């Protein structure tokens, strides 16, 4: 039995997927919520938000993500970073998953990955959970209803959390699996209910396919000046560095908060929604994002709530610190209707430096920008219990290593070419610690970060006096209107300057050690600006 709206020549049966129970094609939000409630997948929250728990997995499983190694991709995938799967293992996995699906109810969503029609990917997402259908409707871009009648997918994703993989039979690592097959244009996800796997699978596809067209895929947020899409800025950064927070600027138009492409026409969002962290979210600091948590259809993932009043607890991280909400872009009042922008005038690379040695903002040359893009430095903080003062540095190349199927230099060279052609100004912004490392210093004041970004984006920072940083070689402004000058010189914010020097030297050595892996692949101008 099938219901909903679908291209009559592109049903699941036409794809060779037979024998399922009820199949629901392209249901809209109210119908998906009704189905999810009927199946007891979650709770209806305030304002019609949908509250879910994802069980064992409350985050992505990068070690369980595999790419099928076939002759067509064997030489282009970065195998150091992507686990391989044999074609035989994938074929067995697909056959067993289809057998497992027989007689069960499924939800199908036909969607677009990419706001630019010239470069979008048409994706069919088949989900066992109704709320996963709701989630992916928010995260990807929705066709007009009439467009569904002729929709044919470039790629299909099947997500079946109740299916458990067999590592011996399916050539994978555990009973959880995310398997990408570029030849069969198919992604299989099993053994995890965490919804983020759906969105990041599409991101990984675009990250592989777009460079062949000369398009730079970016793990970044983006915004543009009001009434002037040509004045676009992109914000690269790993999770927790401030991509979502800093791009949500009431003075600028939001293009998107996480995944974008840079084509010959400019910037475009891959997505149609946002997937924001909600831990410690407040109406004062982030009113727009906070408001979405009580809007119709917003998916609230892994948040503790009062069973009687349905009030959400933004502080309780007992389920996970990675609690999130997913909502369509149009829930943010200053979001772009087209999700398109110009060529970036400013490129911001966000880092959370828990060593407390990087300045709050630095200007980068194009070669330095390539260096920092390939390095992808930030810090994870070990924990909030007392006595844990040792930050955990991490280098995630391209500010998004888990989603990069190709070698990092492919993306780095694309970025370098685009900066050279369009003349973007590049900045490194530290949203981490100042006045000492994590444990002794304090978090960089967000007001100061916003003031520095405003000066960078409106062009006034270009007129400032800059000094060259002795440790890292980039240019640092000496004074910026509205920002405490002492903040701009990290060494001066430390009580013990010898301790600062030792900590800075430690970070310099880490940069040098990490970057050694890229030296054989890069140009002389980038080698010349390498730290250490």
Curated annotation (Swiss-Prot):
- Enumerate the residues binding ATP: 200, 219, 237-245, 286, 324, 449
Pathway terms, separated by semicolons: Carbohydrate biosynthesis; gluconeogenesis
Q: What is this enzyme's EC?
A: 4.1.1.49
Q: Which reaction does it catalyse?
A: oxaloacetate + ATP = phosphoenolpyruvate + ADP + CO2
Q: Which terms in the Gene Ontology molecular function aspect does this entry carry?
A: ATP binding; metal ion binding; phosphoenolpyruvate carboxykinase (ATP) activity
Q: Which UniProt keywords apply?
A: ATP-binding, Cytoplasm, Decarboxylase, Gluconeogenesis, Lyase, Manganese, Metal-binding, Nucleotide-binding
What the entry lists under Pfam families is as follows: PEPCK_ATP (PF01293)
Q: Which cofactor does it need?
A: Mn(2+)
Q: Does the keyword Coiled coil apply?
A: no
Report the cofactor remark.
Binds 1 Mn(2+) ion per subunit.
Protein localization: Cytoplasm
Amino acids binding substrate = 60, 194, 200, 324
InterPro entries referenced in this protein's UniProt entry, alphabetically: PEP_carboxykinase_ATP, PEP_carboxykinase_C, PEP_carboxykinase_N
CDD domains found in the cross-reference section: PEPCK_ATP (cd00484)
| Annotated binding of Mn(2+), by residue | 200, 219, 258
List the GO cellular component terms: cytosol
GO-annotated biological processes: gluconeogenesis
Mainly localized where? Answer: cytoplasm
User: What domain of life is recorded for the organism?
Assistant: Bacteria
Hey, which family's this protein in? Belongs to the phosphoenolpyruvate carboxykinase (ATP) family.
Q: What does this protein do?
A: Involved in the gluconeogenesis. Catalyzes the conversion of oxaloacetate (OAA) to phosphoenolpyruvate (PEP) through direct phosphoryl transfer between the nucleoside triphosphate and OAA.
User: What is the protein named?
Assistant: Phosphoenolpyruvate carboxykinase (ATP)
Q: Which organism is it from?
A: Dinoroseobacter shibae (strain DSM 16493 / NCIMB 14021 / DFL 12)
Tell me the gene name: pckA
């Amino acid at each position: 039995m099938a219901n909903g709206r679908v291209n009559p020549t592109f049903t699941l049966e036409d794809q060779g997927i037979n024998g399922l129970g009820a199949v629901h094609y392209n249901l809209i939000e109210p119908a998906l919520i009704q189905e999810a409630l009927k199946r007891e997948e979650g709770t209806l929250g305030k304002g019609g938000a949908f509250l879910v728990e994802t069980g064992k997995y409350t985050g992505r499983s990068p070690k369980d993500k595999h790419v099928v190694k076939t002759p067509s991709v064997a030489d282009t995938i970065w195998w150091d970073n992507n686990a391989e799967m044999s074609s035989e293992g994938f074929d067995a996995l697909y056959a067993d998953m289809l057998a497992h699906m027989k007689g069960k109810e499924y939800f199908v969503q036909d969607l677009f990955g990419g706001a630019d029609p010239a470069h979008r990917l048409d994706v069919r997402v088949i989900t066992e959970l109704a709320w996963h259908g709701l989630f992916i409707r928010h995260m990807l871009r929705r066709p007009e209803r009439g467009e569904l009648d002729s929709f044919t997918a470039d790629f299909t994703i099947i997500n079946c959390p109740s299916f458990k993989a067999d590592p011996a039979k399916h050539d994978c690592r555990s009973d959880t699996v995310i398997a990408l097959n570029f030849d069969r244009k198919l992604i299989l996800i099993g053994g995890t209910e965490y919804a983020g796997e759906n969105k990041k699978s599409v991101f990984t596809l675009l990250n592989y396919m777009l460079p062949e067209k000369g398009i730079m895929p970016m793990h970044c947020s983006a915004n543009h000046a009001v009434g002037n899409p040509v004045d676009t800025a992109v914000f690269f950064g790993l999770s927790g560095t401030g991509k979502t927070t800093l791009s949500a600027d009431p003075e600028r138009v939001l293009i998107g908060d996480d995944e974008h492409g840079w084509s010959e026409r400019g910037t475009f969002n891959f997505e149609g929604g946002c997937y924001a962290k909600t831990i410690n979210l407040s109406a004062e600091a982030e009113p727009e994002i906070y408001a979405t948590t009580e809007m119709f259809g917003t998916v609230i993932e892994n948040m503790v709530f009062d069973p009687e009043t349905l009030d959400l607890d933004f502080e309780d991280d007992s389920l996970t610190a990675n609690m999130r909400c997913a909502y369509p872009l149009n829930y943010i009042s200053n979001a772009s209707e087209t999700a398109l922008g110009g060529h970036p005038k400013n490129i911001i690379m966000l880092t959370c430096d828990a060593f407390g040695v990087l300045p709050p903002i630095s200007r980068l040359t194009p070669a330095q920008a390539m260096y920092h893009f390939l390095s992808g430095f930030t810090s994870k903080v070990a924990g909030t219990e007392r006595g844990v003062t040792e930050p955990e540095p991490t280098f995630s190349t391209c500010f998004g290593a888990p989603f990069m199927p190709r070698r990092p230099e492919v993306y780095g060279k694309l970025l370098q070419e685009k900066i050279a052609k369009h003349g973007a100004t590049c900045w490194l912004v530290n949203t981490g610690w100042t006045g000492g490392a994590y444990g002794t210093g304090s978090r960089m004041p967000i007001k100061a970060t916003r003031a520095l970004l405003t000066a960078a984006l409106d062009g006034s920072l270009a007129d400032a006096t800059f000094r060259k940083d002795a440790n890292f070689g980039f240019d640092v402004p000496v004074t910026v209107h509205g920002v405490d000058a002492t903040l701009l010189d990290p060494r001066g914010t430390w009580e013990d300057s010898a301790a600062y020097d030792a900590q800075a030297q430690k970070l310099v050595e880490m940069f040098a050690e990490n970057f050694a892996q890229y030296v054989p692949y890069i140009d002389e101008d980038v080698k010349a600006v390498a730290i250490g």
